[in-house]
Structures are given as structure tokens and as C-alpha cells.
A protein has these predicted regions:
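Aromatic-residue-lined binding/catalytic grooves and analogous aromatic/hydrophobic interfacial grooves
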Residues: 1-390
Length: 390
């Protein structure tokens, strides 16, 4: 079970069933072959129509409630951006005479998600941070019914850190996350009921790490960790990151990312346009974009694909404390999904879609990003022998 649901065991002597299906097809009895396959080969179904396969879902939501912004009318010059050269997402806006900036990135070397908020001007940062796993059922996509996915968890807040520990209800997979809120010397951090509050700060850094006891190893697919061992593992990563400055965390991330990303530079004669990406897309579709703008959008899309691969598929890493960090390959939605019922459940379609994810990996000099797929296929050999013997 890579996600909720799980790898249910076989339903019987499928070898004999396959022989009967072949005979039906050979005799032109297609409907009988299909009926037998649906009744004997397909896994046990649930109310989501997933045949017991399960699906990836979002971890949850982080809420950052800015206390000094009451409505959209309070801010001006609002922009959002993603810098493909650094893999850093940014938000910038002005409120009165104060400029607010927010940077977000996911660091592979430090195994944390980092949010950094600054205020430059007369106003100071005042906000609440909370984290909540998502138990919503989601909406039907591609004709698939609502998710029955549920989980239970406990949340504690201490010393500016939000700790969440829980378990999935259907396959008992454990999960844990920790979020540390840090301010500059001028700021005040206060623990609350399920949240951390900040006031009077010019700079805030939010560091999050998370983990589960999943391990891609037949037959248990579990690390064997106790709940406390999993919690300690997640805590270690946040502790290690929290003693570093934001600039150190950012430099680690950018250096690691660019070592792969900068290996390929595509030049199609593009020029940098002052238009926003959505404006470029509209002009491209309408046929009003210049040749240089069309080339810019095409190069951007090419590099965006490489960015997504680097950010969702990295090789196994052994950290300084001996923790081995394994990574599953990117699924049909990559890795970062903001919904609890994504198309195709963010699963792995072995027929061609999974391979398509990795087509550019080797040809654009990102071989290490292909290792999770190789490891995943290798891990299928042992259960595959069991299937072949049925």
C-alpha cells in the first residue's frame, strides 16, 4: 500500500481463470471473457470504485492567517511567481508603506519544506500558523466516486512547534509531521490551541518535515517503526534545519537543485517577455504572440517539466544520523497534489503513463532522478513471482 487502501491479496487461482479467458476469446465469446475477468481478476472494490488499489491524497493544509490584512483591498502590487532557476515560489505585495515578501521551497538535502516571510517597512508581521491533515472526502473526478479515506491524529503545540501524529484507518499506516515557527529577535512566538502565533516580527521562518512508516518492500510494506520512532525521525530533520539560518537553508536547496537543473540550457531564439505567464498562454492560443514569445513559452514548458521531475523524484539518501530516505517515483500527478481526489488517484499506470513521466529524465541529463522508478520496478519482482505462480 503506497497510500490509503492497499495491495490486497489475490482472489483465487487466477492462472486457471486466465486460461478460461483465453479460451473464451479464442471462441469469439468476448462478453463471457470480460465478465469472467471482472468477477475474478479485479480486486475487491470499495465505495470509491478503486478495486482496493488505493490512491495518493494530500497530506493536509497549512494555514497562515495574517492578522493585519483584513481583505484584498488592503494590499497593492500583489504578485506570485515561480523561479524555475532556483525552484523557489514567491509572493510579494505592499500594504501601506510596508513591503511583504514570502518565499517557499522544498529542500531535498535538508528534507524540509520552508516558508520565509519578511516585512520591510513600518508594519510588523502578525500571524497565526496552524496545520491540519485533510479528512475531507473530495469530489468525484473522471467518474470515480467520493473517497472514503479517513485518518485519526493528535496535535500538540510546544515551544513554537506543531507536532501531528496519526494513523490511517484502513491500512494503519502511521504518519507524523512537525512544523517549527521561528522569528527574528524582535518577534514574539506564542503557543496556542493547535496553532502558533507570531507578533512584532520583521522576519518569520516556518520549517516543516513529515514522514510515514511506509517502505516499498514486500510483503509488509512497512519500516517496522513504532509511533515514537517515526516521530523522532521527523523531529530530527526539523531540529537539524531549525539551527540553520534561512540563508543557509536556501543556499543548500538552490545548490542542490541547480546542480541538476543547470545541466541543460535550451535556446530556441526566445527573448524574455514582460508579459505574465497567463498572458503569454492566452496570446499563444490566440495566435497573437510574437515568434520570440512563442519560443519563450515553449522553453519555459520544457524546463518546467525538468523542474517537476527534480522536485518529485530523487534518489535514496542516507543522512548523517543513519536514517535512510527512500523516494517513490513520481506518479501521474507528479507528487504535489492539492486535492483529496485527484485524477486517476495519482496512481501508477504501468501501460505507458508512468514511462511517459520519465521520458525526458535521461535525455536531459537527470539520471539520478530516474533511480526511484528503477527501485520501484525492482521491488515489484518478488510479489511478481507470487503473482506469476498463481
Amino acid at each position: 500500500p503506497n497510500y490509503n487502501g492497499g495491495n490486497l491479496e489475490n482472489k483465487g487461482n487466477n492462472g486457471a481463470t486466465m486460461t478460461s479467458i483465453h479460451n473464451y476469446f479464442a471462441n469469439g465469446q468476448d462478453s463471457s471473457a470480460i465478465s469472467l475477468a471482472n468477477s475474478n481478476l479485479v480486486g475487491v472494490s470499495d465505495d470509491a470504485g478503486t478495486n482496493g488499489y488505493g490512491y495518493y491524497l494530500s497530506w493536509g493544509n497549512m494555514y497562515i492567517d495574517f492578522k493585519n490584512v483584513s481583505s484584498n483591498n488592503d494590499v497593492t502590487n500583489y504578485t506570485r511567481d515561480l523561479d524555475l532557476k532556483t525552484a523557489i515560489a514567491g509572493v510579494n505585495y505592499d500594504k501601506g508603506s510596508t513591503h511583504y515578501s514570502r518565499e517557499n521551497f522544498t529542500s531535498y538535502p535538508d528534507n524540509v519544506i520552508v516558508t520565509h516571510i519578511t516585512a520591510d517597512g513600518s508594519e510588523k508581521i502578525s500571524l497565526d500558523v496552524s496545520v491540519e491533515p485533510d479528512n475531507s472526502r473530495g469530489s468525484a473526478i473522471n467518474g470515480i466516486g467520493d473517497s472514503s479515506y479517513q485518518r485519526t491524529w493528535d496535535t500538540t503545540v510546544s515551544d513554537g512547534r506543531i507536532s501531528i501524529n496519526g494513523q490511517l484507518t484502513d491500512n494503519q499506516m502511521k504518519f507524523s509531521s512537525q512544523t517549527q515557527v521561528i522569528t527574528d529577535n524582535a518577534g514574539t512566538v506564542t503557543d496556542g490551541d493547535g496553532k502558533v502565533s507570531v507578533s512584532g516580527a520583521s522576519e518569520v521562518t516556518i520549517i516543516t518535515s513529515m514522514g510515514t512508516d511506509y517502505k516499498d518492500e514486500y510483503p509488509s510494506y512497512r519500516t517496522g517503526e513504532t509511533a515514537s520512532e517515526l516521530t523522532n525521525r521527523v523531529k530530527w530533520y526539523v531540529d537539524q534545519a531549525a539551527v540553520k539560518t534561512y540563508e543557509e537553508l536556501k543556499a543548500n536547496h538552490v545548490s542542490d537543485y541547480q546542480e541538476i537543473f543547470n545541466r541543460v540550457d535550451l535556446n530556441l531564439g526566445q527573448t524574455v517577455s514582460t508579459k505574465t505567464t497567463d498572458a503569454l498562454l492566452s496570446a499563444y492560443k490566440a495566435g497573437t504572440a510574437s515568434e520570440a514569445e512563442r519560443r519563450q513559452l515553449e522553453v519555459m514548458l520544457f524546463q518546467y517539466g525538468r523542474f517537476m521531475t527534480i522536485e518529485s523524484s530523487r534518489e535514496t539518501k542516507t543522512d548523517g544520523n543513519g536514517y535512510v530516505r527512500e523516494t517513490l517515483p513520481s506518479n501521474l500527478q507528479g507528487l504535489w497534489v492539492g486535492a483529496n481526489n485527484s485524477p486517476w488517484h495519482s496512481d501508477y499506470h504501468m501501460n505507458v503513463n508512468l514511462q511517459m513521466n520519465y521520458w525526458p529524465t535521461y535525455s536531459t541529463n537527470m539520471a539520478e532522478c530516474g533511480q526511484p522508478l528503477i527501485d520501484y520496478i525492482d521491488a515489484l519482482r518478488e510479489p511478481g513471482r507470487v503473482t506469476a505462480a498463481i
